[in-house]
Amino acid sequence: MKRPLAEHESRFGNGFFIIGMNQSEKDFRNKYFAVFLATAAIAAVTVLRLKDRLDPSMRGQAVLSVLFIFQVFTIILLSVALCRNLKRNFYSFGNIMVIGAILFETVLTLFLLSYFLSCIGNPADLGVRVIFDRMIAFPRQFSQYAVVFLGLLCLLVSVSNLSLIRHEGFRLKNLNGVILSLLYIGGTLLLYAAFDLLYKKVIVPNGYAGNTWAEGIYLSVTLFLLLFLCYYECVAIGTGILGWAAARKKPAYDKDYIIILGCLISKEGGLLPLLKGRVNRAIRYAWDQEIATGKKLIYIPSGGQGHGEIMSEGAAMEFYLLTHGAEQDEVIAEKESANTWENMVFSKKIVDREKPGAKVAFATTNFHVLRSGILARKAGLNAEGIASRTKWYFWPNGFVREFFGIMAMNMKAHIRVGLILLLCSVAAGVIFAVSG
């Protein structure tokens, strides 16, 4: 019954790039960003001073040492920021970006360390220009490493799609994994082929080979596209890591309300396995909380009436709850929402009306917890997710859909990152041309 992502779901920012952050969150982001910029400035000044004062045989070693220390500091800074932000706002696209950045920086640091060790006894390979060339070549190497790992995951997801089709029937939405695999692997191979074709068919035949400015422009274009590819690869891995952690996170037993997110019901108004799993998980959590603390909670089954459904999903879940031990005063159904965003917004209105400032949980399927948590936070609900399980062949396809949704919700962040990467790529091209 769910409509495509509502415009409300795409007009917000995220984590470190969030629109409408409160002042403490802005101060938190700005403080770490300021420390990072100060460290980068110190590293840059140090490199420039060493370049002028050391003899040529020592410059490369000094520059590489400064870069290595800077990378280690950056990883530590990002890790501290991630740990603090997970406590403040677990469900955040900013956390996904930081996880991806830590991954990229860690691989780059290992790359620099490996390069340094390989040059021991041969200082000639540690020239400043050689180090620069190695650095700008790293994004392609990183992407090649990532495409092996992600390509294998794409293959496994595609296999799960085949099993999903065998059990659930052929539908386009059951091919999310196959579509993502074709887009990623096919797009990456085409990108590499385009780079080689551009150089062989444009740069060389027109006499631009050896022209430092022409090759600098070529470098800027290829480096930007490779960095943007690396960004999406890191975000994909970061989404997987945070999504896995979100599904395994166990909220404290102190909740006043639990929102149950609706999905498709049967033609007769019964709960299909996916939705039944969500409701049963909410019931189990309520029982566990009452046993552990003696505190009862209120169920908010949330979902409107979709096309072809004889009743709202909220009403169907309400009936199921009442016939499985819940009392009438323990259920407040929300029957108007048409997507996850509205689930959270309309349910928040109920919570604010009944008990402002209440502690809230939400129950949904494991692959859906992360995006639901992001939307809950943006709706003003400081809610924690509780995951129900689903069949092994259903989870990968559902998570791919969630990944597409999370990416679509954060277009402004992608644009900002793209602009930063573009500036870095242009700067690298200019440095290459000037120093050539």
Whereabouts are the PLM-identified features?
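Extended hydrophobic blocks
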Residues: 18-252, 353-359, 363-436
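A structural signal for short, hydrophobic/glycine-enriched beta-strand patches
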Residues: 44-57, 240-241, 246-398
